[in-house]
């Protein structure tokens, strides 16, 4: 079990969302005791709390990128990741880890959102694309991994546990 969280500042106001996201991550820290990673870019902040199952080395650290343009946060498992690795290596991709996160990242880079059609498993994937200044979040077909979304006029936020949203409440 891992945990993901993120906030998109829709109005680009001056509130420091990195501290808010760190507090969200502390609230759900039990989901990923092995590593915690953060990324802030423009009006996006992402975090990942990792329970290292597939590849316990730092090569599976998230948010993950192999080009500093496209970043992924991933919670779950792609059961057929070896099959997808074979398809991607046949067209020239190289892999440095045994992490299905790296497989998902490269599959997205190659096939875009159609990549998710290839995945068998249970997962939630969030992808920040700096080149397009965009973010997508996708769940597996059955929606087996928890994902909660909160949106108001200023923010869109997501978290693996609903209690993480407590951090969105400004201190009095």
Residue locations for each model-derived region?
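Cysteine-centered catalytic environments shared across enzyme families
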Residues: 1-172
């Amino acid at each position: 079990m891992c945990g993901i969280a993120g906030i998109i500042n829709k109005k680009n106001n001056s509130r420091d969302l990195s501290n808010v996201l760190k507090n969200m991550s502390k609230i759900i820290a039990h989901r990923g005791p092995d590593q915690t990673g953060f990324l802030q870019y423009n009006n996006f902040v992402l975090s990942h709390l990792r329970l290292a199952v597939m590849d316990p080395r730092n090569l599976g650290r998230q948010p993950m990128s192999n080009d500093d343009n496209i970043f992924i946060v991933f919670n779950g498992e792609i059961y057929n990741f070896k099959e997808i690795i074979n398809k991607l290596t046949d067209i020239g991709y190289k892999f440095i880890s045994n992490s299905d996160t790296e497989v998902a990242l490269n599959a997205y880079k190659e096939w875009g959102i159609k990549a998710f059609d290839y995945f068998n498993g249970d997962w939630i994937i969030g992808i920040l694309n700096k080149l397009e200044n965009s973010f997508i979040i996708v769940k597996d077909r059955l929606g087996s991994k928890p994902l909660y979304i909160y949106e108001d006029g200023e923010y869109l936020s997501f978290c693996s546990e609903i209690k993480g949203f407590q951090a969105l409440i400004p201190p009095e």
